[in-house]
Amino acid sequence: MATGQKLMRAIRVFEFGGPEVLKLQSDVVVPVPQSHQVLIKVHACGVNPVETYIRSGAYSRKPALPYTPGSDVAGIIESVGDKVSAFKKGDRVFCYSTVSGGYAEFALAADDTIYPLPETLNFRQGAALGIPYFTACRALFHSARARAGESVLVHGASGGVGLATCQIARAHGLKVLGTAGSEEGKKLVLQNGAHEVFNHKEANYIDKIKMSVGDKDKGVDVIIEMLANENLSNDLKLLSHGGRVVVVGCRGPIEINPRDTMAKETSIIGVSLSSSTKEEFQQFAGLLQAGIEKGWVKPVIGSEYPLEKAAQAHEDIIHGSGKTGKMILLL
């Protein structure tokens, strides 16, 4: 190591596998920002299910080893590259993507992936903005083309993306239905924009949703699906004519009957936030900024972990039951 290099604590992954491959190291060199990059002193970093898929080696995208996970960072800019003009040292920011990984005391990010963090939100909330809210925006407006007056079922609404979807959909004039797996989760979903909420652990909850919609032939216009490998077949039976299921999360295969899409001419659409253009990200950020100013963007924080408990966070985000709010690491 060259003399004068600063060191930091960071989670490093040297091999793909279970949560135990997340290793805390205290001698990781603090990266230096290049021309269009900033170095962020991380105060909080969101934990997302996709990070567990990448860590396991089962995801389509495999980072070069070793690597540091983490995208949803909130913190204070420590330094900027020589071509960065929109940000400066000391600015409070959040981002939806990092160059060097967010499970660390410092993280590099490209200057077109970071946004000012308003003083009205703390760093915990900032770490819950990027991927959850941008994914919700893309799912609702890019993938589903949702419109005011339509109905939307958020299937798995008590997590970070689900609650963000409820808030955004309610603010844009949709009738919002949600599901959760606990009484606490149901209450939280109602507090964050849903008109009605159902317990997806009850055997007859699908029938209750159908009754709520009213006309059995009408159905739900849009379903934002967080666990397609369990719910997609039922989703297709809940849709209205021309209805759309947007798949945000899936942990395995599922058998469906394509005939369920034919009579009502329904669609199944996948969503990938990383497919968004820079212009689309700017649109999402503008929508969030307006929501923050008007008060309907209210990130809900769930479980909090110190950096050294990252492996436990990965275990809990997949196997924990009745998750509510956004899971974060605190630094």
From Swiss-Prot:
Q: Where are residues bearing N6-acetyllysine located in the sequence?
A: 23, 186
Enzymatic class? oxidoreductase
Its recorded reaction(s) are: 2 a quinone + NADPH + H(+) = 2 a 1,4-benzosemiquinone + NADP(+)
- SUPFAM superfamilies under this entry? GroES-like, NAD(P)-binding Rossmann-fold domains
Which GO biological process annotations does it have? protein homotetramerization; xenobiotic catabolic process
Keywords (A to Z) from UniProt: Acetylation, Cytoplasm, NADP, Oxidoreductase, Phosphoprotein, RNA-binding
Main location, first listed in the record: cytoplasm
NADP among keywords: yes
Which residue positions does N6-succinyllysine occur at?
298
For this chain, one GO molecular function annotation is:
NADP binding
Spell out the CDD domains in the cross-references.
zeta_crystallin (cd08253)
Any one Pfam family match given in the protein's UniProt record, by short name: ADH_zinc_N
Q: Which InterPro entries match?
A: ADH-like_C, ADH-like_N, GroES-like_sf, NAD(P)-bd_dom_sf, PKS_ER, Quin_OxRdtase/zeta-crystal_CS, Zinc-ADH_QOR/CCCR
Q: What does this protein do?
A: Does not have alcohol dehydrogenase activity. Binds NADP and acts through a one-electron transfer process. Orthoquinones, such as 1,2-naphthoquinone or 9,10-phenanthrenequinone, are the best substrates (in vitro). May act in the detoxification of xenobiotics. Interacts with (AU)-rich elements (ARE) in the 3'-UTR of target mRNA species and enhances their stability. NADPH binding interferes with mRNA binding.
Quaternary context = Homotetramer.
What is the protein name for this chain?
A: Quinone oxidoreductase
List the source organism: Mus musculus
Q: What is the lineage of its organism?
A: Eukaryota, Metazoa, Chordata, Craniata, Vertebrata
